């Protein structure tokens, strides 16, 4: 008879521990999601401020960047070149906002997606605004910091047709 209360006490203790572990995992996931939203907002602010060094600093050393209508960049030099062109555009403005953050169960990998808006000045001097979406894959580094390992974006605007060559 004494084993039944002891067994029940053990079950209650085990269930309590399980609930604490589940709550802790949910809290950790929420903390990671918040941290990544904050990092993504800081990154957007750096790009909007045309701070090339800070903008590029969000990438991991082995990152790949896949801009629209261009080859992917797999070296920091190539990534820097892409961003140099973006931030150097006169009158350009760029911002983005995360709309979804998915964290892997392992807690060391996450996917951030959202929308962006970029305004550039065309050849006639008029502003042209592009809106689109993006996906980033973030990786937790050995030092505990999060860095973007893959970055791709594309426009919601219809593609422009290539110019037809004139007949002679």
Question: What name fits each language-model region?
Answer:
Residues 103-110, 126, 139-145:
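A short, structured loop/turn motif at beta-sheet edges
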Residues 1-5:
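Positively charged n-region of N-terminal signal peptides that target proteins for export
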